[in-house]
Amino acid sequence: SPEDDNYTEELMAVMASFREFGEALDAFIVDKGYKGDITDVKAKVAFIKSKFDQAGIQEYPRNMKKWFTDQVRIKDRQKDRRTIFQLCFAFELDVQESEAFCQKVCLQRGFDCHMIEEAVFYYAIKHHLSYNEAMDIIHQVPKPDQQPLDLKGDVLFTQTITKEIDRFQSS
């Protein structure tokens, strides 16, 4: 508690245990086959771009170099979270690996299936579809009604949504 004599030291020790985004991403890409010099930012960016190319993902994330040089993180905003899932598709992660990547590397929640785009990404990753196939599905989904949904007092948890998505079959 803040009243303890060594509270500041303990808090600093906890803070020191967190890795910068670039460090966490370094460990991730090494685990996924990067063999180059870990201090070579250009080579790391080229490795990530090669994964995007192999996956057929046309758009590269902005600020990739800054992930390693300026410790810029992927922000927790809907448009920026797409970058997280592009990385999941590029590195061919499964659902569990994608969840771990979100939480342990990006320090964000996993799939937010309350968002249509992320629900589709969950479905696509679960069924081993490509990023481009996921985007095709997203473009076909009707725009949601902006009216509040009456759940009759129930709470719609992400786990409930994913259980329903898990029932869908890929054709």
Segments and roles (model prediction):
Residues 23, 46, 81-85, 118:
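A generic alpha-helix surface/boundary motif
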Residues 29, 34-35, 75-83, 111-116:
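Short acidic alpha-helix initiation/capping motifs at coil-to-helix transition points
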Residues 53-79, 83, 104-106:
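Recognition helix of helix-turn-helix/homeodomain-like DNA-binding domains
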Residues 80-97:
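DNA major-groove recognition helix of helix-turn-helix/homeodomain DNA-binding modules
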Residues 95-153, 157:
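Short amphipathic recognition helices of helix-turn-helix/homeodomain-type DNA-binding modules
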